Every structure is written in C-alpha cells, then in structure tokens.
C-alpha cells in the first residue's frame, strides 16, 4: 500500500497531451514502457559508462548502468511504500541524454557549445523525451507524465541558478516547478544512481586493472570488507572478492539510506507529497557519516580511475572525435543526414549549433568513431 506522501499514479498531474488511460497498466508503468521502446534507450547499449564500449564485453555501459539503477530504485521505493513504478521509470530515463564517450564526450560537447548556452545531459534527457523522439503522429516526444519529467529534470535537485534554455522553454508550456524538490521517488532514483555508479565503477576498475586491492587501503571501510572476506573465505578468487565487496557496499548503502529517510519522514511528520516538494532539504538521504564515505569514494575514483593515465589518454581521443565532428558539421551542414539538416532554421549559426549538438549527443560510441573516421580521416579506404 502506498504511503500518503507517495506519488499515486491515479492522482498523476497527467500528460501535456491528454490521452485515454489503459486498464492494464498504471500511468507510470505506461511511461516506463514508452521509455524502453525509444531509440534513445536502445542506443545506451553502445554508450560509455567509464570504459569505451569496445574495450570489453563485461564492462558496464549506459544501458546496463540504467538497469542497475532501476533495480536499486525499485527496491528502495518498495521498502518506503513509495511508487516503485515511478522510481524505476525515472531511473531508466536518467541517462538518456548522455553523449558518446561518457563524461569526456559531454565535456567536449559542452566546450563546443560554450557560445550557445552549453550542453547538459540532464537537460538533453528532457529534450529527447519531449521533442527529439518521433514515435507518435499527434506530437513530438513520448508524452510522459508530469511526475516522470519532473524527476528527470530535477535529477540533481531543485534548479535555483541559471536554467538551461530548452528546460526554460519547455517549462513555459508545462510548469515543472523547477525551484522545488522533486518527489520522493525521484530522490530515490537519484541516490540509486550514486549507489550504483560508485560501487560498479570500483568493480569495473579492478577488472580493468586500473586499480588493485592494495589501492583500496585508501578507503579504510572498503579495506575492512576485503580483510573480513579474506578471513572468512581463505581461497576466494580476486574476481569473486570484488563482487563480494561491491555486494556488501551496496547493501550497507541501501540500509543506511532507508534508515535515514525513515528518520527524516518521522522528524518532519510528512503526510503528503507537497510537503516533500516544499521542504528545505531532500527527504531521501544518507546519514552524514555515509555521505562522507560516498564523497571519499568519489574522490578516490576521480584520482585513481577517471584521472589515471589510461583514462586521460582515452579522454583525449574522445574529445578529438566529438570536437572534430562538431567542427566539420558546422563548416558544412550538407554532411548531416537530411532529416537533421531540415531542422536548422535558415542556416542561422545558433540554430545550426544546437541541431548539430543534438545529433552528436545521440550518437553511440561506435557510430561516432565510424563517422569521424569517414569524415576526418585522410585514409581514402574510409570513404
């Protein structure tokens, strides 16, 4: 049974374009299915999480990451008597706007777009779901419920500073109340993202031999996990050891999140969803100690993994590809597919840049590499 402060699909604020409900799915389940059927969702399979797609079959990509986030979000929401369907749906959609090559690709595209209001993957997710996906004759986008769109655009909390241009434009026709916190389900999806990525980036980095178990000594509590597991299982293999470490880490993070969130709900005497939105802090949270530990893991990952020599070398290549494609399309829009070229407003520089950014952002890693080799390589075999 849903709590009084949960997002009830029967009380959804609805869709921008009115539709007749279906009797066999609630509104949030319907949104989940629409997201899964988008081209953007399928493309996540070939987009980088940390390691470039072709570097190994077992490394995570944006699709597997999104699925893992959705399972954590669903479990947490269920335990808190929230709408697990809404939490799962927001989790599945949260990375749709990512560029090829992960954060390296986003930084490169943002640099290309600095004269045109920049680029943000969270805002791009909204744009994909409300404009760029073309699946329905009556409207652009996939016409999701207000609650799902709110959760996507407020993935990092209320928007209090500068507002992305597309978000501001869309908000005029469908007010997402940008200055308030999102639903508890959206907050769950956001922290499920943190739980999943820090845990699994550790796992993948060990597998890729960028870090080893000795380096985990920098994280005392993680090192304690390793010590305890080795003491309990004398002949444990390195691959099994990291799986057990990650399993224990995820369990403790979820347990802590549930405890602190219940404490917050009781302390604030929350009775409805509006009280959650208008609160001065996120109702869904970890304890202070666990937040500190999460920040330590993030710093460790930046230092040891994301800023490692191997990852910097990959980042340089990815930056060259994204910026190279942007420049060549800006120089000659005829190199764009016809269905993208016609979106440019009278060859205006700003309109041209935005369309090109949308096109590049939608590319998979392998398509971006292929396109770069074809357009930018001096090798005539690529033509």
UniProtKB/Swiss-Prot annotation:
Gene Ontology molecular function, alphabetical: dGTPase activity
Does the record bear Manganese in its keywords? no
For this protein, the record's PROSITE patterns field holds: HD (PS51831)
Q: Which domain of life is it from?
A: Bacteria
- What Pfam families does the entry give? HD, HD_assoc
| InterPro entries in UniProt | dGTPase, dGTPase-like, dNTPase_2, HD/PDEase_dom, HD_domain, PHydrolase_assoc_dom
**Alphabetically ordered keywords of this record:** Hydrolase
Write down the HAMAP family for this protein, in alphabetical order.
dGTPase_type2
Protein's organism: Rickettsia prowazekii (strain Madrid E)
| GO biological process terms, semicolon-separated | dGTP catabolic process
The molecule here is called Deoxyguanosinetriphosphate triphosphohydrolase-like protein
Q: Does the keyword Disulfide bond apply?
A: no
Q: Which NCBIfam families match?
A: dGTP_triPase, PRK01286.1-1, PRK01286.1-5
Annotated HD domain residues: 62-198
